[in-house]
């Protein structure tokens, strides 16, 4: 459960991300594909090369979905319901992949926002991404 401090930390950190949301999302995807090659199997139709327009476009989708989640931090299930349906019923993404992408997002944010990425902010973002992952996998059960 996200505390009020966690929510404040997440919102403040996401404000710092700002207009870089698509870039950071794409970078996190690239990190995931390089670090966890099995995740590539969900994107057989993508050009997964560095700087690929398809990875950039999907990175923006990821970033925009997280921006929506931050904006609806008190109702993540409502905000992410359609995305949960898509990933569970149509795409059938293995739930572990959300954890892998979350880790890569944390690494990406830490590399771009080092002075803002305090232990408290790190913990809050980790809890937030875990909450998002839980919602996205809730319809698998």
Curated annotation (Swiss-Prot):
SUPFAM superfamilies, sorted: Globin-like
Alphabetic keyword roster: Acetylation, Heme, Iron, Metal-binding, Oxygen transport, Phosphoprotein, Transport
Residues carrying Phosphoserine: 3, 35, 102, 124, 131, 138
Positions that bind O2: 58
Annotated GO biological process: hydrogen peroxide catabolic process
GO cellular component: blood microparticle; haptoglobin-hemoglobin complex; hemoglobin complex
The organism's place on the tree of life at top rank: Eukaryota
Residue ranges annotated for the Globin domain, each copy included: 1-141
Heme is among the record's keywords: yes
Signal peptide: none
N6-succinyllysine sites (modified residues): 7, 11, 16, 40
Residue list for modification N6-acetyllysine: 16
Location of Phosphothreonine modifications: 108, 134, 137
Binding locations of heme b: 87
Function recorded in the entry: Involved in oxygen transport from the lung to the various peripheral tissues.
Quaternary data: Heterotetramer of two alpha chains and two beta chains.
Name of the protein in its database record: Hemoglobin subunit alpha
Source organism per UniProt: Pteropus vampyrus
Lineage, broadest ranks: Eukaryota, Metazoa, Chordata, Craniata, Vertebrata
């Amino acid at each position: 459960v996200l505390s009020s401090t966690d929510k404040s930390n997440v919102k403040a950190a996401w404000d710092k991300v700002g207009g870089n949301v698509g870039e950071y999302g794409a970078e996190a995807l690239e990190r995931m594909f390089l670090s966890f090659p099995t995740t590539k199997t969900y994107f057989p139709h993508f050009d997964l090369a560095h700087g690929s327009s398809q990875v950039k476009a999907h990175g923006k989708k990821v970033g925009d979905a997280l921006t929506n989640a931050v904006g609806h931090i008190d109702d993540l299930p409502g905000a992410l319901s359609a995305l949960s349906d898509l990933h569970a019923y149509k795409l059938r993404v293995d739930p572990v992949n959300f954890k892998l992408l979350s880790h890569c997002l944390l690494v990406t944010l830490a590399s771009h926002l080092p002075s803002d990425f305090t232990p408290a902010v790190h913990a809050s973002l980790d809890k937030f991404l875990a909450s998002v992952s839980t919602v996205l996998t809730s319809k698998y059960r």
